[in-house]
């Protein structure tokens, strides 16, 4: 399945969740495009599972093949499958660049990585799906520190999560540790995703 490239606000309204995690997309119209409000149609269990999967997949901007591979990797880890799945998504390089506030969206963060603006432990990494390990340092390359999009993103960046640290002067941050479930989006129902793939 191809990666969605349309307006994020429209997809957020269709899925009923803020994909940017800011809530702005749903502030005025918290219902699907084309509707005048929430309908009374009964939603099946399968539809709920599919919607949960699509919401998480689009939130992190991952195509179906990558999404399923990460899900399978999470199943090999000790602990709760659904939570481990979210932790692995959080450890993607593009997501951490977004968490640092270096880009306004995960899509923008992915472009920064793909265009070679980011290093991990001093080495340039241009693979957005690169899985960062706790303790690794992510930084903007010296020659990329004047990129306008980065400066603009930092001006409106929200506070960083406790599982990362970021130095705005040096434009570098550390993936301190894996997050705890309570630190991540509580609108995501990862157990429904586990059920979807267990059908």
UniProtKB/Swiss-Prot annotation:
User: Where is each S4 RNA-binding domain found?
Assistant: 91-151
Q: What does UniProt give as GO cellular component?
A: small ribosomal subunit
Q: Which UniProt keywords apply?
A: Ribonucleoprotein, Ribosomal protein, RNA-binding, rRNA-binding
MF terms (GO), sorted A to Z: rRNA binding; structural constituent of ribosome
Query: Gene3D superfamilies, per this entry?
Result: Ribosomal Protein S4 Delta 41, Chain A, domain 1, RNA-binding S4 domain
Give TM regions: none
Read off the CDD domains from this record: S4
The record's family statement is: Belongs to the universal ribosomal protein uS4 family.
Q: How does it assemble?
A: Part of the 30S ribosomal subunit. Contacts protein S5. The interaction surface between S4 and S5 is involved in control of translational fidelity.
Which PANTHER family does this entry report, sorted A to Z? 30S 40S RIBOSOMAL PROTEIN, SMALL RIBOSOMAL SUBUNIT PROTEIN US4M
Protein name, UniProt field: Small ribosomal subunit protein uS4
According to its UniProt entry, this protein's organism is: Exiguobacterium sp. (strain ATCC BAA-1283 / AT1b)
Q: Which gene encodes it?
A: rpsD
